[in-house]
Swiss-Prot record:
Quaternary structure, from the entry: Homodimer.
Function: Catalyzes the hydration of fosfomycin.
Cellular component aspect of the GO annotation: cytoplasm
Keywords (A to Z) from UniProt: Antibiotic resistance, Cytoplasm, Manganese, Metal-binding
Species whose genome carries this gene: Listeria innocua serovar 6a (strain ATCC BAA-680 / CLIP 11262)
Ranges of residues in domain VOC: 4-122
UniProt keyword Zinc-finger present: no
GO term, biological process aspect, one: response to antibiotic
Name of the protein in its database record: Fosfomycin resistance protein FosX
Tree of life domain: Bacteria
Residues where Mn(2+) binds: H7, H69, E118
Length: 133
């Protein structure tokens, strides 16, 4: 029986650069670094973001960008602050997609390795309520 999400692993070209990205944007807490050791496929680091285990492993960046993404929930009043954090690291912010009123505001942005992230100020319940109108 599935009991929850265990972790998310992202392959990144530069562990240190991605560490800064995760810490500055998501307030990630680094909890492990393999250093020069390799216990898995390559050097790796583990982080906690709002209790979620995020693993980054050294490897080649994604060659293509897609809409596959990881979305983190934030409060609506924090959106502008997060957008400034994203801009301060020179991340590419995608234009906002069209939304229906009540769906919650989002910002989408790519990291250095073409992973797409979303910060969303809304909940599943709010979205379902709006879609069922």
């Amino acid at each position: 029986m599935i009991s929850g999400l265990s972790h998310i692993t992202l392959i990144v070209k530069d562990l240190n650069k991605t560490t800064t990205f995760l810490e500055e944007i998501f307030d990630a807490e680094e909890i492990y670094s393999s250093g020069d050791d390799t216990f898995s496929l390559s050097k790796e680091k583990f982080f906690l973001i709002a209790g979620l285990w995020i693993c980054i492993m050294e490897g080649e960046s994604l060659q293509e960008r897609t809409y596959n993404h990881i979305a983190f929930q934030i409060q609506a009043e924090e959106m502008d602050e997060y957008i400034e954090r994203i801009k301060s690291l020179g991340m590419e912010i995608k234009p906002e997609r069209s939304r229906v009123k009540g769906e919650g505001r989002s910002v989408y942005f790519y990291d250095y390795d073409n992973h797409l992230f979303e910060l969303h100020a809304g909940t599943l319940e709010e979205r379902l309520k709006r879609y069922h109108k």
